[in-house]
């Protein structure tokens, strides 16, 4: 892939000078959904698919972007003096947002770039293609300008900062953290309240991770994501009148049951219940994985989906069909929606010998019920973002 991106760069912008290449993965969250902005735990991993970038510094302040995924847009031209969202169409907002964030954080971007990007993350799948683009841009800027004091965790935080403040998307830290800090064959047990984390080896003896992409189009900003977030913030404020906590992630299930009546609205109560119970499920799931109890891990994945469907109400017929059909397939250890919901994808752990049957059976049932096809990807857990040698 690296060579294809370099060839494309040379064709568009010429092959001379110091052209450098970078990679940032996509991510999937195994369990711990809609907990990252509620001060809870998440358990994501980086994937071996992601975003490749070739870049070269310019002597002026011009920016030239080309995406091999959006060839019809051609070369999109901009400048470091035009940090205005929406001027240049959708996708350059992610790299430009990261450049803006570096400037805001005291790391000036004084020269422009020629940039070619290629991503093999399915677009709109919910596997974090925009966070991957942000992170690969952050790695590039750190490398090109020699900003060695910036850590990979800083890059993740700058990515979140640019999403929140440049792109206007109220995301948590999970996506950028998983992409920046990923480790081969491990998932990251991350406490989003303080960014304490540990790597947990994912040993799926005789099984693999299968991503089922619903192909229902959704955008994070225009989905009900922000609505759920504000429902949880209101619920937290109501609980804080009777209990001294900073986030819903601090509550055990028992503590929540004791104070839940402080939440006046039954819908908000359900939202908060999901945040608390999902956090506990995530803690239990990591313990199960450490104990090599993959069956228990799968049960907790299934319970996570039920909660996202019934209490948090972020699934919809597409994701429910993918998951419920998966539950009926032989060899499926666990299956749940992953990501923000309202479309996007599901993650399943499937015994290797049953994968072909799983894809055929779930795929046929989905097409019959929904009217268009789902896509399936058997994925591996890879390392986080970095410079390609």
Stretches with model-predicted labels:
Residues 342:
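Glycine-rich phosphate-binding loop
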Residues 1-27, 52-88, 186-334, 349-389:
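C-terminal nucleotide
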Residues 132, 345-349:
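FabD-like malonyl-/acyl-CoA
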Residues 44-46, 54-57, 89, 106:
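Short, charge-rich binding segments
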Residues 113-117, 319, 335:
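A short glycine-rich, hydrophobically flanked beta-strand micro-motif that places a catalytic Asp/Glu
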Residues 1-22, 28-32, 38-41, 80, ...:
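Gly/Ser-rich oxyanion-binding loop with an adjacent helix/lid
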Residues 39-46, 228-229:
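Short Gly/aromatic-enriched secondary-structure transition segments
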């Amino acid at each position: 892939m690296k060579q294809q991106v370099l060839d494309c760069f040379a064709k568009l912008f010429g092959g001379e000078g110091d052209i450098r290449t970078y990679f940032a993965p996509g991510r999937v969250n195994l369990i711990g959904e809609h907990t990252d902005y509620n001060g809870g735990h998440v358990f994501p991993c980086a994937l071996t698919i992601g975003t490749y970038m070739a870049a070269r510094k310019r002597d002026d302040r011009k920016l030239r972007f080309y995406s091999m995924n959006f060839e019809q847009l051609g070369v999109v031209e901009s400048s470091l003096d035009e940090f205005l969202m929406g001027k240049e169409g959708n996708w350059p907002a992610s790299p430009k947002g990261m450049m803006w964030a570096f400037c805001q954080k005291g790391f000036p971007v004084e020269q422009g770039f020629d940039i070619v990007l290629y991503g093999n993350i399915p677009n709109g799948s919910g596997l974090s293609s925009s966070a991957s683009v942000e992170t690969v841009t952050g790695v590039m800027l750190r490398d090109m300008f020699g900003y060695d004091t910036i850590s990979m965790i800083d890059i993740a935080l700058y990515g979140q900062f640019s999403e929140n403040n440049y792109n206007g998307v109220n995301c948590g830290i999970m996506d950028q953290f998983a992409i920046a800090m990923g480790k081969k064959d491990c998932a990251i047990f991350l406490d989003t309240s303080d960014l304490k984390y540990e790597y947990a080896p994912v040993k799926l003896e005789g099984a693999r991770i299968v991503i089922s992409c619903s192909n229902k189009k959704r955008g994070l900003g225009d989905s009900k994501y922000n609505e759920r977030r504000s429902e949880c913030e209101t619920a937290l404020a109501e609980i804080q009148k009777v209990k001294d906590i900073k986030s819903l992630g601090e509550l055990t299930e028992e503590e929540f049951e004791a104070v839940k009546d402080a939440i006046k609205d039954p819908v908000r109560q359900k939202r908060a219940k999901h945040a608390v119970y999902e956090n506990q499920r995530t803690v239990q799931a990591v313990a199960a994985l450490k104990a090599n109890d993959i069956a228990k891990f799968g049960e907790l994945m299934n319970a996570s989906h039920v909660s996202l469907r019934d209490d948090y109400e972020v699934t919809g017929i597409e994701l429910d069909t993918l998951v419920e059909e998966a539950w009926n397939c032989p060899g499926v250890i666990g299956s749940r929606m992953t990501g923000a919901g309202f479309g996007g994808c599901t993650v399943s752990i499937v015994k290797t010998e049953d994968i072909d049957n799983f894809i055929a059976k779930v795929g046929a049932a989905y097409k019959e019920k929904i009217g268009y096809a789902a896509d399936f990807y058997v994925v591996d857990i890879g390392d986080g973002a970095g410079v390609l040698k």
